[in-house]
From Swiss-Prot:
<dbReference type="Pfam" id="PF22873">
    <property type="entry name" value="OAF_C"/>
</dbReference>
<dbReference type="InterPro" id="IPR053894">
    <property type="entry name" value="OAF_N"/>
</dbReference>
<feature type="signal peptide">
    <location>
        <begin position="1"/>
        <end position="27"/>
    </location>
</feature>
<comment type="similarity">
    <text>Belongs to the OAF family.</text>
</comment>
<dbReference type="InterPro" id="IPR053897">
    <property type="entry name" value="Oaf_C"/>
</dbReference>
<dbReference type="Pfam" id="PF14941">
    <property type="entry name" value="OAF_N"/>
</dbReference>
<dbReference type="InterPro" id="IPR026315">
    <property type="entry name" value="Oaf"/>
</dbReference>
<keyword id="KW-0732">Signal</keyword>
<protein>
    <recommendedName>
        <fullName>Out at first protein homolog</fullName>
    </recommendedName>
</protein>
Length: 273
């Protein structure tokens, strides 16, 4: 009999293959490359890496405009890091690229465990994948800066991931409180103008003077990531077993303080939501 709510095993394009794990070696980083469909319909390649020794997962994709977006989940430290490398428009006098990092608390039910990710394989590498579930837009107000020189105290991944964004690493007061309770040193965090002061500042897209401070907004999307394990039932097994993953898409919108409008030149058009 099939247990209620548990599907029968059937061929899948993405499978958990525990028998292949020994071939990789214990804890060896594993990489999976998949073709994914972006929210605007275009297709790009996404790289997913899992390191079960470090208990971390990283995801990277390039947007059609050349922006490189990455996401790192550090399960040991309860930290997730978003990074965007945004290409500048040289004809407008912008720098070659601008880097941003956003650091928030990781909830362990947001993405599958690193051990499961390391065992993920695909049967058809040419298939274009589209997320099964679209999760709602999450709007975050980043009101604290992270001190890059002390960032390793928060997560050892910060130095590599945010190396190009030394002066543009942001987090939130509520995340800071959580990490301080976990024993993270306060020297990791630096004050930005208070929320009440930032509330009085205009949005950058409303500011014409490139030297004026303002509140910048940046949006990014994780087009496809394994957010949940699937369980199947077989007549040969008394209990459900892991047999695949459920994929999700999620978008984020970050508001943060910049001392000069020049540091937020992309925030020109009205942002949805």
């Amino acid at each position: 009999m099939r247990l209620p709510g548990v599907p029968l095993a059937r061929p899948a394009l993405l499978l958990l293959l525990p028998l292949l794990a020994p071939l990789l070696g214990t804890g060896a980083p594993a990489e999976l490359r998949v073709r994914v469909r972006l929210p605007d319909g275009q297709v790009t390649e996404e790289s997913l890496q899992a390191d079960s020794d470090a208990d971390s997962i990283s995801l990277e994709l390039r947007k059609p405009d050349g922006t490189l977006v990455s996401f790192t989940a550090d399960f040991k430290k309860d930290v997730k890091v978003f990074r965007a490398l945004i290409l500048g428009e040289l004809e407008k006098g912008q720098s070659q690229f601008q880097a941003l990092c956003f650091v928030t608390q990781l909830q362990h039910n947001e993405i599958i465990p690193s051990e499961a990710m390391a065992k993920l394989r695909q049967k058809n590498p040419r298939a274009v994948r589209q997320a099964e579930e679209v999760r709602g837009l999450e709007h975050l107000h980043m009101d604290v800066a992270v001190n890059f020189s002390q960032g390793a105290l928060l997560s050892p991944h910060l130095h590599n991931v945010c190396a190009e964004a030394v002066d543009a690493i942001y987090t939130r007061q509520e995340d800071v409180r959580f990490w301080l309770e976990q024993g993270v040193d306060s020297s990791v965090f630096e004050a930005l103008p208070k929320a009440s002061e930032q509330a009085e500042l205009p949005r950058c897209r409303q500011v014409g003077d490139h030297g004026k401070p303002c509140v910048c907004r940046y949006g990014l999307s994780l087009a496809w990531y394994p957010c949940m394990l699937k369980y199947c039932h077989s007549r040969d097994r008394p209990t459900p077993y892991k047999c695949g993953i459920r994929s999700c898409q999620k978008s984020y919108s970050f508001d943060f303080y910049v001392p000069q409008r020049q540091l937020c030149l992309w925030d020109e058009d009205p942002y949805p939501g």
